Amino acid sequence: MTTPQEDGFLRLKIASKEKIARDIWSFELTDPQGAPLPPFEAGANLTVAVPNGSRRTYSLCNDSQERNRYVIAVKRDSNGRGGSISFIDDTSEGDAVEVSLPRNEFPLDKRAKSFILVAGGIGITPMLSMARQLRAEGLRSFRLYYLTRDPEGTAFFDELTSDEWRSDVKIHHDHGDPTKAFDFWSVFEKSKPAQHVYCCGPQALMDTVRDMTGHWPSGTVHFESFGATNTNARENTPFTVRLSRSGTSFEIPANRSILEVLRDANVRVPSSCESGTCGSCKTALCSGEADHRDMVLRDDEKGTQIMVCVSRAKSAELVLDL
């Protein structure tokens, strides 16, 4: 099996690179010698070191039973920080790329008996892996709702409109017209016993799903975002962070994140998106009350974990397990 380097990253090869929709490319990553890759489960993501020096996190979208490859889809984001553009424009088939081990902050709940999967745009990637896994298992039913602007911008369109998937997938195009948005009320009006909802997409879609599932049992509706939220909408105040292992304290000013301050002090914390959406910087919280601004943590994790790239403090001090 492929083994990580000293920095914990795998050195893989871009076995194939293909444009699969408007502004969206798929990348198939394999071991250069053909060795099996470390396993993953549906919902997992990995971090890629892209040519411009930044690191970006992408969800795996292939079948989790496959051990010979990782498949990701990358959307070219002209309004981003350049990571996706560099990955798409500055790589070719056959190039080497450094990739983290897969990690999963968005797993399918083993207690669920059926699933509603909701994807918006490039948010299809973890949902497709989930759908593949559920189809392979053949034990639990699912229905995938996939919302995009038009067919040309729909990743995996040909596959998901094939006879194989037709009975399990509903694709809806709004053509950029808000009045043609999909009406989810009939989907979420009533929940079935042990039915869970998984949603990945733009903030507006997640807000809609959250609003329509407010009456569902706690812990049955799960979200993963691929875009930053407006964390600046709240007023920032300074606070102190203390590291439990060294006892060192840092003042976090109103205009800087915990991650930025720790990075300047050469305190190693994994990171990628820096928008509270990927889960890379999740850090154990020993004491203090956090002001959670991420889109990753479940309610039952918020007392003991914090995403240091965006979240701040409600108390005067936070103690982190670093």
Swiss-Prot record:
[2Fe-2S] cluster binds at C273, C278, C281, C309. Pfam families: Fer2, NAD_binding_1. One of its GO terms (molecular function) is 2 iron, 2 sulfur cluster binding. InterPro entries: 2Fe-2S_ferredoxin-like_sf, 2Fe-2S_ferredoxin-type, 2Fe2S_fd_BS, Beta-grasp_dom_sf, FAD-bd_FR_type, FNR_nucleotide-bd, MRET, OxRdtase_FAD/NAD-bd. Keywords: 2Fe-2S, Electron transport, Flavoprotein, FMN, Iron, Iron-sulfur, Metal-binding, NAD, Oxidoreductase, Transport. Residues 239-322 form the 2Fe-2S ferredoxin-type domain. FMN binds at R56, T57, A73, V74, K75, R81, G82, G83, S84, T125, F226, S275. Monomer. This is Phthalate dioxygenase reductase. The gene is ophA1.
